From Swiss-Prot:
Functional note: The short synthetic peptide SIIID (range 54-74, with disulfide pairing 1-4, 2-5 and 3-6) reversibly inhibits human alpha-7/CHRNA7 acetylcholine receptor (IC(50)=880 nM). Shows a paralytic effect in fish.
Matches recorded under InterPro entries: Conotoxin
Expression sites by tissue: Expressed by the venom duct.
Protein name: Conotoxin SIIID
Compartments (UniProt record): Secreted
Family, per entry: Belongs to the conotoxin M superfamily.
Length: 74
């Protein structure tokens, strides 16, 4: 009985090695943070819209248009 369990354990470890498990650095959240540190433009990533900076003298900040955020302060 014990030898059968040993064989089963060995076969399972050979078919599914522990190195196949994802590491902390492979998590999608970490990859997003790395991508955000790069210079991202909306031309490269259409789903990413860069926040416009439209502060100036006499302008109110932040600005909204039809309840949509359009720009923030510097």
């Amino acid at each position: 009985m014990m030898s059968k369990l040993g064989v089963l354990l060995t076969v399972c470890l050979l078919l599914f090695p522990l190195t196949a498990l994802p590491l902390d650095g492979d998590q999608p959240a970490d990859q997003l943070e790395d991508r955000m540190q790069d210079d991202i433009s909306s031309e490269q990533y259409p789903s990413f819209v860069r926040r416009q900076k439209c502060c100036g003298e006499g302008s109110s900040c932040p600005k909204y248009f039809k309840n949509n955020f359009i720009c923030g302060c510097c």
